[in-house]
Amino acid sequence: MARYRRHSRSRSRSRYRRRRRRRSRHHNRRRTYRRSRRHSRRRRGRRRGYSRRRYSRRGRRRY
């Protein structure tokens, strides 16, 4: 389904852009506060895990 929507740009963009733009402005600000407070631990845990594996040398030197 994702491929079909991407290829049909003329019709999908006109309808999806208008709906997403109106919702994105109002809902993005409200969801950012809720997600940041609730899932802040999960996101930080995942980011720390990746940062240690990728930037293990840089992290040790900085600390």
UniProtKB/Swiss-Prot annotation:
Instruction: Let me know which tissues express this protein, per UniProt.
Output: Testis.
**Gene Ontology CC entries for this record:** nucleosome; nucleus
* InterPro entries assigned: Protamine_P1
* Primary residence: nucleus
Keywords assigned by UniProt, alphabetized: Chromosome, Developmental protein, Differentiation, DNA condensation, DNA-binding, Nucleosome core, Nucleus, Spermatogenesis
- Identify the stretch(es) annotated as Disordered: 1-63
- Localization (cell): Nucleus; Chromosome
Q: Which domain of life is it from?
A: Eukaryota
The entry's family comment says: Belongs to the protamine P1 family.
Protein name from the UniProt record: Sperm protamine P1
The scientific name of the source species is Antechinus stuartii
In the UniProt record, the gene name given for this protein reads: PRM1
